[in-house]
Each structure stands twice: as C-alpha cells, then as structure tokens.
A protein has these predicted regions:
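Conserved phosphate-interacting/catalytic interface
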Residues: 5
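Active-site segments that bind and position negatively charged phosphate/pyrophosphate groups
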Residues: 11-127
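C-terminal charged capping/lid subdomain of soluble metabolic enzymes
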Residues: 113, 119-185
Length: 185
C-alpha cells in the first residue's frame, strides 16, 4: 500500500539515488498509483492486485541495494516504536509533509514523482496527500491518538534514527523534526 509508495518516493528522492533505482521507483509509482485505487474500489480486481504486487516489489529496489531513505521513514520508525502508530499509517501521515518540507532541495525531482503518479504540474506533496485521502487513510498525527505534548520527545527520539541524517534536506536538530511534526499534527 502506501508503505510501498513511501519506499518508492523516498528512494527516488534519496541522496543515494541512481539511474537503476530511479527507473524502478518511478515505475513502482505508476503501478501503485493505478493499482491501489482500483483495489480499494474492487478488492477482487486481480489485475490491480498484480500492479500493486509488482509496484511494491519494485519499490524495494533501493532499500535492498543500500539506498538510505529520509525523514518520512525515520519519523515513522519513532512514531511506531515510541507511540504505537502502525507502520503503514506512519507513511500515510508523514510522506506528504516531509515532501513539502524537503521541496526546497529536491523540487525538480519531486515533479517527476507527480508525473509518475499521473498529476503533472501539481506539487508532489499535494498529489500524495490527495492520493492518500482517496484511500481513506489517516492524514494527521492527531488522528492516531498521540498527544501533542509527546511531540518534543518524539522529535528527540528521531535523532537516534540513522535515516534522519540521510534526509535530502539536512536535519541536524530536534527543532527541525518538530517543524515537520507540527505540519503533520
């Protein structure tokens, strides 16, 4: 599902991206962008399920070849491990906000994400937000039952996750993580 979309997006935008991972991840986004809404509409649609299966498999190309991911995954690890938010939900919540926060450093590549998702000319953060909303998945941290008072502790804990430091836009302090968490609140 959206976890695979998150893998594809963060691999494509990774500081370790390369021609091999780029091709696999953009194709994964095309497949998932078509397949996921179709499966939601008709769970018995086997062609749509195959597209999702292939997209999910291709989305892992970067991870299995050593590409480091970014803040969506890093924050997601902490939301899951420290606050009990299901792993798939962390991607639904964090990915669009991380894209928006990172746009100043990888906006051109984010345009390719939007194109792969079939929405050229729309900011990737909006494309993913709309896509996730269309699947009726959670979009804010608030929806998960996490308390706002917990955000500073979660931001501190994010500094313990290696992928915080491989985010395309440099993160070096909990205050920067708090900027993203507040967007997602």
């Amino acid at each position: 599902g959206i976890r695979a979309v998150d893998h594809a997006v963060e691999t494509y935008l990774s500081i370790d991206a390369n021609a091999y991972t780029d091709g696999a991840c953009l194709q994964a986004l095309r497949l998932l962008g078509e397949g996921l809404p179709r499966v939601k509409a008709d769970p018995s649609d086997l062609d749509a399920r195959l597209k999702c299966l292939m997209g999910a498999w291709m989305s892992m190309t970067g991870v299995i070849t050593g590409s480091r991911l970014g803040a969506s995954h890093a924050i997601g690890h902490i939301l899951g491990g420290s606050a009990g938010v299901p792993h798939g939900h962390t991607s639904c919540i964090m990915l669009p906000y991380v894209l928006k926060w990172n746009e100043s450093v990888n906006g051109a590549r984010q345009k390719e994400v939007a194109i792969a998702m079939g929405r050229a000319g729309v900011p990737a953060s909006d494309v993913l937000n709309d896509f996730i909303c269309g699947l009726d998945m959670p979009r804010t941290i608030r929806e998960t039952g996490v308390e706002e008072d917990d955000l500073p502790r979660l931001a501190e804990n994010c500094m313990l996750d290696d992928w915080t430091f491989s985010n395309p836009r440099e993160i070096r302090s909990p205050d920067q993580v708090m900027e993203i968490l507040r967007m997602a609140w």
